[in-house]
Amino acid sequence: MRVTIFYLAAGNSRRFGENKLLYPLDGKAVYRHLLDRLAKIAGRHENWELLVVTQYERILEELAPLVKAGRLQTVFSPDSEKGISYTIRAGIEAAEKQNADACACFAADQPYLKEETAERFLESMEMQKAPLGCVFCGGESGNPAWFSKPYFSELKELSGDRGGKKVLKRHWESVIPFLVEAAWELKDLDRKEDLCCRDTGGCHE
């Protein structure tokens, strides 16, 4: 199965007060924590491709060496400032060019998600040939999420700031759950007070 690991690094960070993806955390930018783990994961699986979609030229510049080394690909999406649907559409169009059978969407503002958890999620979805899937913790669904090829067209039809959760809800009976016990792993950074490395012992690789 050809899988595109789709990394959303294009948010506007309105509630954070500045670009949260570039904010320093434990020695590197927020967006690099999970990205570096996903790059390792993709490198261990022959048919998995890592694709970063961003509206930020600085992120493109910083990732250029990894692109040159063949560790990931990038897509510039300036329209992402209008909403997450534009980021998703740009990523899906790139995934289709890669002839992907499925894509997994990861958010760049989840720096605490462990490498082991991310890889187990991907392997579980691939092994089950999941039509749709997402993580669950405490009865709540969240990112990352999984979409097989039959749902790509619906993802491209999203508008404004509507994300993939709308597609999941529409086909809830087809969603395969992946349980995560540690809620802090799924914590996303909307505000500076959400920074919680001190509570988790650091952003371990």
Feature-to-residue mapping (PLM):
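Conserved alpha/beta core of the MobA/IspD/sugar-nucleotide pyrophosphorylase nucleotidyltransferase superfamily
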Residues: 1, 5, 153, 157-205
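N-terminal glycine-rich phosphate-binding loop and ensuing alpha1 helix
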Residues: 2-55
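Glycine-rich phosphate-binding loop of ATP-grasp-fold ATP-dependent ligases
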Residues: 18, 141-143, 186
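Conserved beta-strand scaffold positions in the cores of enzyme catalytic domains, especially
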Residues: 22, 74, 132-134, 175-179, ...
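Short aromatic/basic micro-patch
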Residues: 24, 112, 146, 188-189
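Conserved N-terminal catalytic core of the sugar/cofactor nucleotidyltransferase
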Residues: 33-101
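Short, structured coil segments at secondary-structure junctions
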Residues: 67-70, 151, 171
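Conserved beta-loop-beta/alpha segment of the NTase-like Rossmann-fold superfamily
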Residues: 81-149, 153
